Amino acid sequence: GPGGSGRGGTWVTRAVRAPWAVVAGWGGAVSGVGVGVAAVADIRLTQGVAKLGLPETGLGIPPSQIAPFLVRRLGLSQACRLAVTGGRFDGHRAVAIGLAHEVAEDEDALEALLATTLKQVLRCAPGAVAVTKQLMNDAGLIEHEALLDGAADAFAVAARGAEGIEGMTAFMQKREPNWPGGEA
């Protein structure tokens, strides 16, 4: 947009559409587009002492580039309250309103939580993660019956694909899967 205002929204949109899991962890100050990035991450972890805010309206501008993402993540009521008040809040409140999934009490705990989460993510099949993200992002945007039909088709394709075969074989053999084209 004019003056480069679309750059933050473009980056946030890319994060939403990424075919891999987007994990965000923060412990310091996060404001404006940073809150938008936090809102679109698939997994969101924070320190309790983190300071988050939406200062845009206090600066005379709307949080235009991140507003749709905040509404989708937090719901209209909560997103509107934060935006029209220039809301400032900590990591505990971020969890309470649904912006973050878990809170860590210090930097070491956040690093440990991130490491555990990344290990969990890396155990999952990359292709299955990509399809899952697409299905979940389509939820609410596509008619329910069409979404279910698409989900059934995606499942059938995945089950017959290399990842589906390896995943089920590993399960039956009681071992960790060795994902084609990736490292577990």
Spans of features found by a protein language model:
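A short linear-motif detector with a strong N-terminal bias
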Residues: 1-4, 31-32, 61, 136-137, ...
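Glycine- (often His-adjacent) and acidic-residue-rich active-site loop
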Residues: 1-14, 30, 142-143
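Compositionally biased, intrinsically disordered low-complexity regions
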Residues: 3-6, 10, 38, 166-169, ...
